[in-house]
Amino acid sequence: MLAQSHPEAILNTALHALAHEADWRAILDELPAPIYTTDAEGAVTYWNRACVALAGREPELGRDRWCVTWRIYTTAGDFMPHEQCPMAEAIKEQRIVRDSVAIAERPDGSRVAFRPYPTPLFDEAGTMTGAVNMLIDVTEEQSAVLLEQADRCRRLAGALYSRESNIVLKTMADGFERTAAGLKPDNDV
C-alpha cells in the first residue's frame, strides 16, 4: 500500500500544498492517506475523503476536536481521551509528534490501528496557526505485534511456578489476543 510505504512523502506533499497552493483542499483530497487539519485550538477544520474510510464516520467540522476518529485506545487497549491523543499533544506542545500507534474505534464497533503524524503549522512570524495530521493504517502490523506479545506471555507463564504470575500473564495474553482479533484493516485506504 502506497500510504504505508511512503508516509513521509505523502505528508510532505500535504505540507507543501498547505503552504503554497491556493487550492490545497483539492490536492489533499487526492492523497491516498487520511489527512485532516485543525485550528490552533484543535478544532477540526478540514478532512479528506480517506478520513471517512478510516474513521468510519464523517467528522464534524468545528465540533470535533483533536481527532477525526470516534474513540481512541492505546495499543494496550486502554481508552485514550481525545485531549490526550498525539494530535492534542502536538498542538498543546507546538511540536511534531512521531513514533506512536493508537487504535481507533469506529461507530460500528470495529477497530483499526493507525500511526499518526501530527504536525503543527506556523505562519511566517512563527505563530502556530493550526496543525495537520496524517493517519496511516497499521492494523495488520499491530495485530501481528499483539499476537506476538500474547505468545510471549503464554510462554513466560508456562515457565514460571508462581500461580499468581501465571494468572496475570494469561490474562494479559487473553487481552492481547482480544485486541488483535478486534482490529479490522481498512482496505479502502
Language-model features, listed with the residues they occupy:
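PAS-family sensory domains
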Residues: 5, 86, 105, 116-119, 126-138
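Sensory modules in modular signal-transduction proteins
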Residues: 15-38
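Conserved hydrophobic beta-strand signature of PAS-family and PAS-like sensory domains
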Residues: 35, 44-45
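PAS/PAS-like sensory domains across diverse signaling proteins
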Residues: 41-43, 53
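N-terminal capping loop/helix in small sensory signaling domains highlighted by a polar->aromatic N-x2-3-F motif
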Residues: 48-52
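Terminal output helix/cap of sensory domains in signal transduction proteins
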Residues: 59-108
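PAS/PAC sensory module
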Residues: 99-103, 110-116, 132
